[in-house]
């Protein structure tokens, strides 16, 4: 990251949950690998669990590949800039690590890959919206950028 473009802040907001991995340091290290131009406009990355949201938020739906998906089942969300509120990325740590054995999560390389898949996919949504708009399906573009950033 260059000095004139600050890196997005990483915030941990959990309710009745302790992540089994050092999610803050993992995400901070992954963000350091993303070229600064792609993160311009992203204010923060919020690490949270699904219980942290209120009932209304947990019941919300989002669109993915022309289908409605419950937010409570998502691993991450990208919130674009809107009415003066800067863009942000929300990662649901409990959903990211759900179903993965603890001994696998303790291997740093694998833990980084698991978080990189979700984080870079959401950064891909930001790139698609703010930097390189394309007339293709949103999830496909986000997957493309996610894979490109993981290399």
PLM regions with names:
Residues 1-90, 98-108:
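A metal-dependent hydrolase signature that marks the N-terminal structural subdomain at the beginning
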Residues 26-33, 119-122, 145-149:
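Amphipathic alpha-helical segments that form well-ordered structural scaffolds
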Residues 49, 131-133:
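Acidic carboxylate-rich catalytic motifs and surrounding loops in phosphoryl-/glycosyl-chemistry enzymes
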Residues 96-118, 133-134:
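Short pre-active-site segment immediately N-terminal to the catalytic Zn-binding motif
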Residues 117-130, 142:
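Active-site recognition of the HExxH zinc-binding catalytic motif
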Residues 135-151:
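Post-HExxH zinc-binding segment in Zn-dependent metallohydrolases
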